[in-house]
Amino acid sequence: MGGCFCIPRERSLTRGPGKETPSKDPTVSSECIASSEYKEKCFLPQNINPDLTLSFCVKSRSRRCVNGPLQEAARRRLWALENEDQEVRMLFKDLSARLVSIQSQRAQFLITFKTMEEIWKFSTYLNLGYVSMCLEHLLFDHKYWLNCILVEDTEIQVSVDDKHLETIYLGLLIQEGHFFCRALCSVTPPAEKEGECLTLCKNELISVKMAEAGSELEGVSLVTGQRGLVLVSALEPLPLPFHQWFLKNYPGSCGLSRKRDWTGSYQIGRGRCKALTGYEPGEKDELNFYQGESIEIIGFVIPGLQWFIGKSTSSGQVGFVPTRNIDPDSYSPMSRNSAFLSDEERCSLLALGSDKQTECSSFLHTLARTDITSVYRLSGFESIQNPPNDLSASQPEGFKEVRPGRAWEEHQAVGSRQSSSSEDSSLEEELLSATSDSYRLPEPDDLDDPELLMDLSTGQEEEAENFAPILAFLDHEGYADHFKSLYDFSFSFLTSSFYSFSEEDEFVAYLEASRKWAKKSHMTWAHARLCFLLGRLSIRKVKLSQARVYFEEAIHILNGAFEDLSLVATLYINLAAIYLKQRLRHKGSALLEKAGALLACLPDRESSAKHELDVVAYVLRQGIVVGSSPLEARACFLAIRLLLSLGRHEEVLPFAERLQLLSGHPPASEAVASVLSFLYDKKYLPHLAVASVQQHGIQSAQGMSLPIWQVHLVLQNTTKLLGFPSPGWGEVSALACPMLRQALAACEELADRSTQRALCLILSKVYLEHRSPDGAIHYLSQALVLGQLLGEQESFESSLCLAWAYLLASQAKKALDVLEPLLCSLKETESLTQRGVIYNLLGLALQGEGRVNRAAKSYLRALNRAQEVGDVHNQAVAMANLGHLSLKSWAQHPARNYLLQAVRLYCELQASKETDMELVQVFLWLAQVLVSGHQLTHGLLCYEMALLFGLRHRHLKSQLQATKSLCHFYSSVSPNPEACITYHEHWLALAQQLRDREMEGRLLESLGQLYRNLNTARSLRRSLTCIKESLRIFIDLGETDKAAEAWLGAGRLHYLMQEDELVELCLQAAIQTALKSEEPLLALKLYEEAGDVFFNGTRHRHHAVEYYRAGAVPLARRLKAVRTELRIFNKLTELQISLEGYEKALEFATLAARLSTVTGDQRQELVAFHRLATVYYSLHMYEMAEDCYLKTLSLCPPWLQSPKEALYYAKVYYRLGRLTFCQLKDAHDATEYFLLALAAAVLLGDEELQDTIRSRLDNICQSPLWHSRPSGCSSERARWLSGGGLAL
């Protein structure tokens, strides 16, 4: 749309002074030759990369640097969107670009374009700042939008490679094959090619068509209309897409820039100016002045126009003044705040939606409506009641949703037309479409206070007295207010000034006769005005040549008189429009320039003709030719105003966007932003509609006000932006909060207390919806102050809302401070319902304070008031609150009775979303009571009913509560793995719809565990899928520990699924993630758990050594985690024993035994020495094994405390007996050990073990070893450890 690129940059507004004569050079002027190779290369097909990188960074305005936490949050959000990029694609589709990929690590998007229109629109949105604002919509959540200070301080800055963007633009331009260029220099074709090649002047505009690659192109001059070949080296494509679009869609001729014209950096001016040189007029309508004379500027003087309207301060005469004859530094330039339009014109743009102001205000009051003064609140219910679902009645008509349409209508070029008196059919059709289909002259009864009653009977044309009234009426010298209706394009003069004609032809005949009498009577002004009226009526009948004659006659009659400037302007502009329609530019080139000056230089002038757009287009073409941004801006504004008045909204957008780029400074840009938001809303572009109002809001922070109709527009469009389900009754997006705050500030300036209060209530509703009661309390406190100023009812309602917000913020004491005085202020004669409402809220506050008895009394009083007025709903709420109070007080039986009664009362009510959501909460409480009373079937039924009601209304939060309860029921109360998985899956779906990424990650983790517990091939595969999805989310959320554990879980699952090649990969990723987080305890834990994967498995168990010995042990030593190190050495010992690596096992067991003596835990020491004894035994080091076993026995308590200790004694002494007898060949010591084992077995009461030991003793006594050594003589062996040695 009407935009420019950062690159190509706008060149100097003067592209070379003056119109140059053709060069004597037979080809081109010398200044073009140097760059001919480059220019030819630009027009040749090139293999360019069609993708563009869009980078962004989040910056703090106050600190002027990157906001690190927000930048990281935005990057993580982008990472989450990489695999689910539908939302991003839709955003860039609105921004007229195509998403190729997302590069979250670099905070970049890769986009591409297929047409020049796409790159034009995108570059426009980029330069208007809409791309960065739309990225805010995408990347920031409600927490950001609710933080007003953060929003005001934060901006997203986007950047692209401007040169690459220009390259893509030129490539697409050439690909389309038809575009417009500017002549870089004067060109005269050689004699042999005369007639075949074009003769060009410098800066001349040419329409070019690409046929095939070569040094010459076919072109048509927009100045002469001639067709021919032109050298590529002499041309430069117009760098601005808006200019290409405009020249293609509004075809027509244009002039050349003149040598003595000044444009440059000059602004539109007004006031007085000084003549550089004197001027002798060539026409009667031009002003005569001398050098140095002071000239008063009537309206504006605009750089790029040949003329402006001036008044001589010496003679008082008014006429056209050639712009080049005045000193551009002598006039007063327009301020930056109104660079191209007057204050009245700016207000006309701002008033675009003002007719909807009352309706929009009504909508805000409806949105703010609450039933808190008549409806009881349920304990735990999270928001102030919302207004009714059907808001269509209060929805302003002009802001209904519309289906997406085209950005603008494509206009087809009109073919060449004959300039004869009879117009061709295509011209007639075009003009007929611009005029009304039929017209009925009104009867006298239709009119209010007509100016004239005209009547012309047959045969009265010759009687002068019959025309005296109209001639006297029209022959006023200069302008009068009653002539205003003559010049508007609605032909209102037919109803406001004349009547009594039933047919238009009859009226035309009367005017024609009047013209003749005016001419005879030399009544100049009446004659001119009658010609003007006849010309306008001829245009209505598409008789352009006839109209042209009338207008030319009127101008001739005026003879340069400017007393009625409105008449002069309307005559010139209408005649110029006809010249352009009939292709008669050669006949009226001077008049075209003067008509353009009257059109552009006179502010606040009402449009007089629908085909005035042709003159506006001519002025805009001239602005493009001379490179005058002020003239281009002024022409764009005129096009906007005219098209809006004609209701052709689709055609306005390109001009409005271009004008916004050219304006740049408020309040002019503010006025155009207002138009843009209106148009984007019409075209169903919600991102852009909100972004344009945000732009307005930024300016509003600098002192501008935000209209209420734009707030309504934002409220409508923000609900379309977010991917949540369609918002229910009264829900407002947090994205609207900044604009609501701006509107609130504007209402404070206007002292509009009623709307202020409505906005405060809406803002509080948003904060409560997002569980930010502190923000709600802030705005409700304001609403209370405003309510007290507005009236008792508003004050009462605001007080209740504030008390409810305090309750939701768990500030029961403050709620009591509001409610108790409110109750005292109510008279006994006041509404019973209002007293009941206060008692109910008092009950909630007292319950929050833990004052159960007083809370119960308040609830009962509220119940009594509801019963007195017969309000079943309020009775149900009071019963439910009593039940909840009883439940919290562990009074199960009363709780059950109250809640059952509440359910019965709710069932009597007519079903609605509000009551059903309350019933969900009651069912959950009742289920809790029933389950705690072991009525599991009935409790389950209540849980399922709660879920059913939530599903019925598609209410996510109630479904979430019910689903949580069902998951707990099937996991802990009545375990059922399959049902538990089913409800966890539904819980996951709800989390995804709510976009709660943290909840989604936790649920995927839980689901992975549940599927893993089923231990089937299919469940393991599903578990792996869940773990991988949770991993992606944890990385997105920056939860390093969770991400590392997810990697570990994935490795564990790959091991169970025997996908060994992926196990090490996942385990290493888990450890690296932990190490990068610089959390050594997490890394230590993961090293150990990674080793456990192999240690607890059946395959590749030796891989555990690497994770234990090389990873966990060094970290444990560095962290001085002695117990962890001991546990790992114990695992290493056990692992090596199972692998029969006894030498290694001895090393690890020895280290474990040493560490165990440091811990001070005898049990750990006992385990370590027992393992060491086992290793020595396996290595056939029996004496050391005996010593270690004896050491373990010395660590046991002296008195047996349990059968387990007795069993341990029996087994160890039995092992020592066998070891001593069989390996050490000491029968006497073996006997002692067996006797001790027998004693332990007797204490244990194990008859079988006793028999085995007695059998062993008998065998020893009968063995040769028993007799080979004297009785009582034991062999001498090492007893270092068991003898009290302190070190191994």
Swiss-Prot record:
Signal peptide: none annotated. TPR repeats lie at residues 528-561, 757-790, 836-869, 1001-1037, 1084-1118, 1119-1152, 1166-1199, 1210-1244. Residues 386-395 have a biased composition (Polar residues). It comes from the Eukaryota. Strongly expressed in brain and spinal cord. Expressed at equal level in spinal cord and sciatic nerve. Weakly expressed in striated muscle. Keywords: Charcot-Marie-Tooth disease, Disease variant, Neurodegeneration, Neuropathy, Repeat, SH3 domain, TPR repeat. Residues 386-405, 410-444 are annotated as: Disordered. Pfam families: SH3_1 (PF00018). The keyword Repeat applies. GO terms for biological process: peripheral nervous system myelin maintenance; regulation of ERBB signaling pathway; regulation of intracellular protein transport. PANTHER family: SH3 DOMAIN AND TETRATRICOPEPTIDE REPEAT-CONTAINING PROTEIN 2 (PTHR22647:SF2), SH3 DOMAIN AND TETRATRICOPEPTIDE REPEATS CONTAINING PROTEIN (PTHR22647). It is linked to Charcot-Marie-Tooth disease, demyelinating, type 4C: A recessive demyelinating form of Charcot-Marie-Tooth disease, a disorder of the peripheral nervous system, characterized by progressive weakness and atrophy, initially of the peroneal muscles and later of the distal muscles of the arms. Charcot-Marie-Tooth disease is classified in two main groups on the basis of electrophysiologic properties and histopathology: primary peripheral demyelinating neuropathies (designated CMT1 when they are dominantly inherited) and primary peripheral axonal neuropathies (CMT2). This is SH3 domain and tetratricopeptide repeat-containing protein 2.
